[in-house]
From Swiss-Prot:
An example Gene Ontology molecular-function term: hexosyltransferase activity
InterPro entries, alphabetized: GT23_dom, NodZ
Cell membrane recorded as keyword: no
Gene responsible for this protein: nodZ
Function of the molecule: Fucosyltransferase which adds the fucose moiety of the nod factor on its terminal reducing N-acetylglucosamine end. Uses GDP-fucose as the donor group.
Keywords: Glycosyltransferase, Nodulation, Plasmid, Transferase
UniProt keyword Oxidoreductase, yes or no: no
Listed name of the protein: Nodulation protein Z
Family: Belongs to the glycosyltransferase 23 family.
Pfam families linked to this entry: NodZ
EC number of the protein: 2.4.1.-
Length: 322
């Protein structure tokens, strides 16, 4: 095992966690370091000192030759200094509270480091920020190829696919609402909530009108019971996976309030979307559908600069439709 490390720390949704892990893995591979994942304090668990990775994913020893620490050894492991970014060289007690400005500063420092294709003298590089868009797609594919849901979760995914998807051309619809949280980059898509739902329904109709080799089945995955009611009222034959929702406008679905089952439900939907023939991403800024974006033959997105404009992305070409 290498004696220098990249530590990937996240407490957010699985899309962000895995995408950020891909960026950390690429740097670890390039600089001959061991990669460690620390998902303690995960939004999916009410146990702050439990590493969420082994709760939801199968144990692995390496990712394409990069040694990988992914269990609760991170609780006792003493990562060697010096550290990068420099913030982590402070006494541990002073690192407990990190203001948002510091997190964004570290994200930018890591971005510069990754883009420069250089290494640093630090023995441990700490990646504790959202690192979406900070690596190439092949790094993302490597993570999704290597990191597998636990066997019992995969069995649930397979069973649902066989019962509801097999023999159909599946259209997966992901609608990230936020349910009252600060949705940040997603906000422009929800400036007019009624229009947003109308746009989603328009996209579903557009997807159904495209050529399909088999009978079409539409599945909706959303974090909002309100959105579920609105969309299913217009498409009565819509398929949904039973799960618990939080009260209206009470915050994001990825919450410790729902326990481990909430995380399992999220993984089931994320991987089922990746098995669809067509996926609609609303908004396309959500990392939850990144796996589907990389694996599904046809993706329908909403233009970042003009959310009313649909973009149809095929594996070999890109077309637009208004």
């Amino acid at each position: 095992m290498y004696n220098r490390y990249v530590l990937s720390r996240r407490r957010t949704g699985f899309g962000d966690c895995l995408w950020s892990l891909a960026a950390a893995w690429r740097y670890a591979q390039r600089t001959a370091r061991t990669l460690a994942v620390d998902w303690r304090g995960s939004c999916y668990l009410d146990q702050p000192f439990t590493n969420a990775f082994p709760v939801f994913f199968e144990p692995i020893k390496d990712i394409a030759g990069v040694p990988f620490i992914c269990d609760n050894r991170v609780n006792e492991f003493s990562f060697p200094g010096p550290f990068f970014p420099n913030w982590w060289n402070k006494p541990a007690i002073e690192c407990v509270y990190r203001p948002d400005a510091q997190v964004f500063r570290e994200r930018d420092e890591l971005d510069e480091l990754f883009q420069a294709q250089d290494d640093v003298e630090a023995n441990t590089v700490v990646c504790d920020a959202c690192l979406m868009w900070r690596c190439d797609e092949e790094a993302e594919r490597q993570i999704f190829c290597s990191v597998k849901p636990r066997a019992e979760i995969q069995a649930r995914i397979d069973a649902i696919y066989q019962e509801h998807f097999y023999g159909y051309s599946a259209i997966g619809v992901h609608v990230r609402h936020g349910n009252g949280e600060d949705v940040m980059d997603h906000a422009p898509y929800w400036a007019d909530p009624d229009l947003a739902v109308h746009q989603v329904c328009t996209a579903i109709n557009a997807a159904k009108a495209l050529p399909h080799p088999k009978p079409v089945r539409v599945i909706l995955c959303t974090d909002s019971a309100r959105v579920l009611d609105q969309v299913s009222s217009r498409f009565p034959d819509l398929l949904t996976i039973p799960k618990s929702f939080r009260a209206d406008q009470s915050g994001p679905l990825h919450s410790a309030d729902l326990g481990v089952e909430g995380g399992i439900s999220a993984l089931v939907e994320m991987y089922l979307l990746g098995l669809c023939d067509t996926v609609i991403r609303f908004p396309p800024t959500s990392a939850f559908t990144r796996y589907a974006r990389l694996s599904v033959p046809r993706v329908i997105e909403f233009d970042l600069n003009d959310p009313s404009r649909l973009v149809v992305i095929e594996r070999s070409s890109t077309n637009t439709a208004s």
